[in-house]
A protein has these predicted regions:
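Contiguous hydrophobic, helix-prone segments at protein termini
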Residues: 1-202
Length: 202
């Protein structure tokens, strides 16, 4: 069910981006201040219906997923290291950013290529007064011996132990399905945040 919800939320975000492009195109053809204000109001309404609820929902799902992981550690089913390795195996926007930043640092990706994907982001903050990456002047240095790899599909937590843990609290769900929820919830929140910020910045 969460997968279907995520698909619907992603579709809504894509619809919102199309609405933004349509409104921006109309505004580029007029100097009428009243028309522009009407279009701004229309875009804000679209964000309220096609963006904010979707991002909020995905953020809550990710919070639940991380809380479940913390509970699995507290109950002794998994160690902190195992959960940390599981988190690292998830192919999020953040992990892709680290990989591409490393490529940029080694000269394997141009500044224009990097900015095209990540230029709208701000370094570790929501503060709108902070410059985004495409406004910053920097020459990154990275650890050349650090091993960065493209990630494959996450294998998830050990299903046998996870099944015992779920059974112990009366959760009637297959461990594979639960693993899929954990991964998709964490990936989905980051993806939607990334796409939502692109729309806001444009």
């Amino acid at each position: 069910k969460h997968g279907l919800i995520s698909m619907k939320d992603n579709a809504d975000i894509n619809h919102l981006e199309n609405e933004r492009k349509r409104i921006a195109s109309l505004d580029s053809e007029t100097n009428n201040i009243h028309r522009i204000l009407e279009d701004i109001t229309e875009l804000l309404d679209a964000i309220k219906s096609l963006g904010t609820p979707q991002f909020t929902r995905q953020a809550r799902m990710a919070f639940m997923a991380k809380s479940f992981c913390s509970s699995l550690v507290e109950a002794g089913w998994f160690t902190n290291d195992e959960i940390e390795e599981f988190m690292k195996s998830i192919n999020t926007v953040s992990s892709k950013f680290d990989y591409d930043f490393h490529k940029f640092s080694l000269g394997l990706m141009s500044r224009n290529e990097f900015n095209k994907i990540y230029g709208h982001l701000r370094s570790g903050t929501y503060d709108i007064r902070t410059d985004s990456y495409n406004q910053m002047v920097f020459r990154p240095v990275t650890e050349k011996n650090k091993n960065y790899k493209d990630k494959n599909v996450s294998k998830g937590l050990d299903e046998n132990r996870l099944k015992e843990a779920l059974t112990s609290i009366g959760f009637d769900i297959h461990p594979k399905e639960f693993n899929n929820f954990l991964v998709s919830a964490i990936e989905g929140r980051e993806f939607l945040k990334f796409e939502f910020i692109i729309i806001e910045r444009r």
